[in-house]
Amino acid sequence: MVDKLSNDEREVGKQNYYNAVTSYYDVNRRDFLRGIVATGAVSGAGLGAAYFGYGQVKDPVRIAVIGTGDEGNVLIGGCNPNYVDVKAICDIRPFSQHRAFHGDCSSPSALIRRPGLISVAGYSNEAEARKNVKVYDSSNGGIMACLDDPDIEAVIIALPLWLHAPVAALAMERNLHVLTEKLMAHNVAQCKVMGRMAAAGQDKNGNPLHLATGHQRHYNVKYENAVNLIRWGLLGQLHHIRAQWHRGNLPGRDSWSMPIPGGEKMPNGKTFDRIAKDLAHRRAKLKTATGADVKRLQAEIAQWEAWDADKTIDPREHGYEDFARGDQMFTAEEELHRWRLFQRTGAGLMAELGSHQLDAVSIFLSSLRSDGKKVHPLSVHAVGGRHIMPLDRDAGDHIYCTFEFPGPEYAETFDVGYYDPVENYPNGAVPGYEQDPNKKVVVTYSTINGNGFGGWGEVVMGTKGTLVLDKETDVLLYRNSDTSSKVGVKKEEGGYALDTSASGDFAAPVAQTAATGPVSRGYREEIEHWAYCIRNPDKENKPRCYPEVAMGDAVIALGANVALKNSQTGKGGYLQYKEEWFDIDNDATPDGSDIKREQEYMLKDVT
């Protein structure tokens, strides 16, 4: 997102951000950051609880993790044993079960993201872990048996998207709390059914059910600080946000097109088995390995053997299907292992990637509302398609969107950073969209394959400053568009502003010290807060991404897919959003999904 910036410009932006955050807390929550530093509550050791206002729980919530693939294992890595006790996992794949215990040994960075239950819970080995963690798969009743386990109070769902809604509904029907991965559901009607069930349901103790969705930016401290700086007025009047998620995936090198266990046929009739080939390579290297390489290769071989064992699973027994697209035939194995590539099991780039960043956009714009409600877009133009990939999928590999959001109304005391004496403008408060339909915030979004330049992130532009959020870990702040000047915060008439004269000696501010250690992307905090809400069932306690918020994100993403479909069928890539789509109690949907039909589907047993 910031590839055009030099290292010096990046460092200036980081220090400007830390200076501004320190000033914000000195003015608004004096000694908050200094208290965090003094008590050692930094990084994963309590920073989230301090920022987001939740405490410890006396009795960790007993949970099951249903779906322990890539994302499920990231969520296992976010399970703090002081808040949740993982009593069961559920997955049909030996590969997923193995990583749930041992973590992902494919690379050092993968093992950090997916450390496994043995590491997370402090077990000595898999045998000890299995004494405390029951494994559900096709041999012992799978998902249905897991949901009926009397020792389970709540479930984390990290299954392929098409299974989010039915498993969540079956869990809530059994009085279980739910945290499901994003997107909330496969279509908008499913989201509304889930939201209604959560509102009407109770847990086994008669307390409200908590249905949370894993848009983890709601629990990212960097995003929370960004919101505070926006509210404080340092960016002035927001008018444009640019966001992207660009990846270098190419044919033959696509992270969403995973190898098929057991291999697959090539055009020459031969079978290519990438997993077996990699396994043989590691076994050969082990024969001559010495020192630390022996242990590393043994761990990798165990993981690849589990991956190879996935060939014993028949996906057709679990709802996956063989199907055709034109003359191209696809197998149920492809639909299971590459579910993101197909519309029946996934919902494409906007669901998997775009929903995260449009959620961030909504967080930024909603922060300026006085009523606390989520901002909804007015319209979207979308184009895209399958521009570089072969016909090995029915989901596109490029999408470009332009969203119009209503501009917020600013308080009369809010300093927008400009005044025209000739026009006497602004004369009082800068109006919002409801007072002046010209007041809009335009958001451009692209998610592409084939070139990863810029990576992923968001750039928020206002009349006084620019805020860059890069890959969820770095935040850069600049006065206007000046990327070279060191700035601090100066109090002016009407508010606060970035100013070069207030930059001080640029020593490491308290905010930087408080953010030492690995940057949390919010997974740990979202699970901790969900558990805290379960154990503290007061009305004011609810997850930050509760059903109305998560459904709003789904409407935005799935609505963009409707606009994209319009562009591909000669109707023009446009969609005007309707407020009733965002109302859980209204049956209207943008994607043609039907409430009654989804209710019947969602309460059927799943395999």
Roles of regions detected by a PLM:
Residues V221-H281:
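Rossmann-like NAD(P)H-binding beta-loop-alpha module
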Residues G384, L391, A395-I399, E404-R521:
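NAD(P)-dinucleotide binding in Rossmann-like oxidoreductases
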Residues N175-N187:
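ADP-ribose/adenylate-binding Rossmann-like module
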Residues G67, L234-G252, H376-H387, V443-I448:
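NAD(P)-dependent dehydrogenases' Rossmann-like dinucleotide-binding region
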Residues T213-H215, R340-A351, G384-P390, T444-I448, ...:
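Active-site rim elements
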Residues V2-R174, V193-L211, G262-A306:
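N-terminal glycine-/serine-/threonine-rich beta1-alpha1-beta2 phosphate-ribose binding loop
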Residues M266-N438, G452:
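Rossmann-like dinucleotide-binding domain that binds NAD(P)(H)
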